[in-house]
Curated annotation (Swiss-Prot):
Belongs to the archaeal DNA polymerase II family. It comes from Methanosarcina acetivorans (strain ATCC 35395 / DSM 2834 / JCM 12185 / C2A). PANTHER family: DNA POLYMERASE II LARGE SUBUNIT. It catalyses: DNA(n) + a 2'-deoxyribonucleoside 5'-triphosphate = DNA(n+1) + diphosphate; Exonucleolytic cleavage in the 3'- to 5'-direction to yield nucleoside 5'-phosphates. This is DNA polymerase II large subunit. Its EC number is 2.7.7.7, 3.1.11.1. InterPro entries: PolC_DP2, PolC_DP2_cat_dom, PolC_DP2_central_dom, PolC_DP2_N.
Amino acid sequence: MGETIASEEMHEYFDGLEARLKEAIEIANRARAQGGDPKPTVEIPLAKDLADRVENLIGVQGVAAKIRELETRMSREEAALEIGKQVAEGVVGSFPTKKDAVEAAIRVSMATLTEGVVAAPIEGIDKVELGKNDDGSQYIRIFYSGPIRSAGGTAQALSVLVGDYVRRGIGIDRYKPREEEVERYVEEILLYKRVASLQYTPSEDEIRLIVRNCPVCIDGDPTEEAEVEGHRDLERIGTNRVRGGMCLVLAEGLALKAPKVKKHVNKLKMDGWDWLETLIGGAKSGGSAEDEQKSKIKPKDKYIRDLIAGRPVFSHPSRPGGFRLRYGRSRNTSFASAGINPASMVLLDDFITNGTQLKVERPGKAAAMSAVDSIEGPTVRLFSGDLVRIDNIKEAYELRPQVESIVDIGEILINYGDFLENNHPLMPSPYVFEWWQYDYEAACPEKTPEEELKNPSSALALRLAEEYNVPLHPTFTYLWHDINRNEFEALRKFVVEKGTFDGEGTLKLPLTASFEEGIKPLLEKLLVLHRVKEDKILVEEALPFVLCLGLDSSLKEKAGMPDTDDMVEAAGVLSGFKVYPRAPSRIGARMGRPEKSDLRKMSPAAQVLFPINNCGGITRNLVSASDYTSCMNGKIGEIEVELGLRECPACGKETYFWRCECGEFTNPKLSCPRCKIDVRGAETCPKCGRKPTSVANVKLDFRSVYKQAFENVGEREKMDLIKGVKRLMNGQMTPEPLEKGILRAKHDVYIFKDGTVRYDMSDIPLTHIRADELGITATKLLELGYREDIYGNPLERDDQVVCLKVQDLVISYDGGEYMLRTAKYVDDLLVKYYKVGPYYNAETIQDLVGVLLIGLAPHTSAGVLGRLIGFTKASVGYAHPFFHASKRRNCDGDEDCIMLLMDGILNFSRSYLPDKRGGKMDAPLVLTTRIDPKEVDKEAHNIDVPARYPLEFYRATQEIKNPTELESIMDLISGRLGTPEQYEHFMFTHDTSDIAAGPLNSSYKTLGSMIEKMEAQLSLANRIRAVDAPDVAERVLKSHFLPDLIGNLRSFSRQRMRCIKCGEKFRRPPLTGACPKCGGNVVLTVHEGAVRKYLEISKEIGERYGVSSYTRQRIELLDYDICSLFENHKVKQLGLSDFMSGSAR
């Protein structure tokens, strides 16, 4: 790895982190050397760069040095292909067979493409085999599995290209499919679309084109229960079930990312891929950027197609009253995160808070929300009739009970970089203060204080417009584009005939007449703020408004209406000023996932990976297991469990511990599972050839083990609950030491599958901090290595803004409390179990400031070293965008976990990881110690970091330009790579006074039942002008309640029975009525209440909101089905005589 290009201060920072990491590893190695863990040393290898991560992840020696060499002279993608070729040819690494070399080559290449972070190269590729074509030649078969999804479409597609590049180098022929195989792919991918989901589904002809021409066979493991019907039992396809990995690579990889594959094919001058031109030409883009540009940005309703009850719609697509787009970046936005005023959060009934995910209309699919109070908040109509804009959170709480309607929900701050990342045409910018300031500076020689310019009086705004021809200030620019010519003329006429204008600049309009003639709604559409007093509408500082209507201060018409249907242009012509659109672009949005700040548990939760079978009851309680008896005369605490047996080489004692009582380290005791004979020094059984295993059913005196564990850590047996597991998931059935579970139960912490204690939080970016926001002082920041604020001033005050260092994190107070409990557990473990000194010595969460953490994202296998520097009341985890990107995450609503460094290096073991597909995902198989901006996910390179956007940017947005056309004039991180500025001196365009402002938790989390949430959702929809409440009701019924009712009804008729004592499940009730295994009661798993759950609310909502007759009829039919199933309609038993007439009797 080359030397990190950074300032002296950043070098000190990195060196400090690595020195402390080295010290922690030495302590952990000293503790583990005693033999209390599966390995006597720390099991998380360190990696300074991408090359190290790839070598550690795949395990091919020599790869790191070769990658570093290749990356000095070629791009990442080219280096990935070349390293794959060299591994296959044997230049790097050594393999016994050609097949093994090809498999390693493809895994190494894919790991390079995914920065050595995700688990896809080891979990997403099951195996690589060599198949035979009908002409006798060999071809490569790559077997993909479900976890390949985590690699992303581009890496999936390029892994196929790698396969072709490798096979050419070692002389393997291309794949020549049979016609029935081609049709099998067509059927299978379309079936996968129905049973699972695809981002992009290619047409049948596109699938045939890919399969017939792809030189590598894209194969896969069966992942779905669904089976193909038409093309079954094919000779070269080993299953009739759907192969999910294959479908993902072909559809979301090759088909969707064909242009990117073509680019690399051209660069490498590879033949045989000409068919990509046909694929690209025939593929439907689903609305490309160019098409959208031509159509002047049409509304998109994709984000509201699948509504969920309880998660409100805040604005229908591009509708007036919805979020008004504002360009810019705050210190807590960008990287797919957007900002809104915290007053908007409060007035939207607390559904949105920091970290809440919104599904948005554009530029991407989703965004996590952050509080930015320097942009405009919502405009609301109070029950008094007043129309007020609320920019202050305190005022929002005070006025919330008085709000009748939300006329406009305020601005949403989205940075240019998100448009660039999504390749979305730039939407027209509103005429905002930042743009007006450029016009003011160009035209006006006066120097007026900026605060006065931000909130000018009407007199100042008009004087600047008249004297210097500066456009009318945004404060006095109304939403003229939201009304038509007839409405404009009606408003103008009403003001002339019935308005009065006093000497203080207040326009008075009669309230009753305003309602009768529809004038008050027009004022609300225009966002002309006003008060209602004594049957009058009062518009203060109204002269700019009056002038834009073409009237003078006496409310006399100055000029006739111009011949135009553009009311912004009309206002400009009539006033004589330059008037620009105030809100030309609206962004539709609905709630996605709520924010998260919670401890990570397995399901069911566990505190130690120690098996107790069913002996601990349904809670898997070790306390109960220690008192378990199999029968009346059985030995107390004797249980039968599956464990990996080990043998001491010195004294021959059999145990499951890693170190014998005599002090020697033990070895697995292997035996044949079929022949039951010991197998020593061989890979297979000498009799039957099977692979031996150390796993066996063991009768364990658990009571003795349990008591001994308490004695070992000096704790009293006073605990009520210590949660173990029924059965271990790892291949060798390796248990954790029981002592660890005792200490975790003492401190009330829980573990994940690898033995580590984790805490989950929603990801939010943060590039700048203030000590007073983080619960610390400037003095503490100085201790942590911060020296100056963003303006170069010495750091002296708590309110100074400083640039966040790339591996520093801010976590929630709740997370801090959990980490404090974890730190106390780790110290107890070090002292009482490992017999070394404590490490943290923490009594309060403030003592944790400065400790090292590991950050880890789901679906990845590389942790990132971080440092805790403070706490926030928001339920999120703040970190530098580079930190999130180094885990291959952005901030569109993703959530990741943290763990204490010492907990990770002390307790993590690969031996505990499940031996199944995906078992190595979400585990720190490697630890990145230093973040290099060049090696993080490229999305982070598109973040803009100027203090203000250039004037050319605002002008370009009016032409709906592609964002790539402006890269050269924007200060992007991509332009700073390879310089010390890549780490420091970032700026932002919009500040916020408190990154954690807003509700503490989304009301989605605080409301009780789903019906309560639904009522709150519809109540809010009724109040928001930009939302069509009946449409929301219809969509929720169709996409949530009705499918749930149908699914639950089906589940009821197909359900299994469950024993409430041991959890055993039965297809039908046992004849005895009791569980044959343990004698416990057997109950239904689906109850009548679950089936009826949403029926009454569906009927009520259907009536209240007048949903379509088709939807109402569906509800009626379901009501009939449910009643016929559950209601006992008593039928009178009739005899034959009841059908005879009286005379016949």
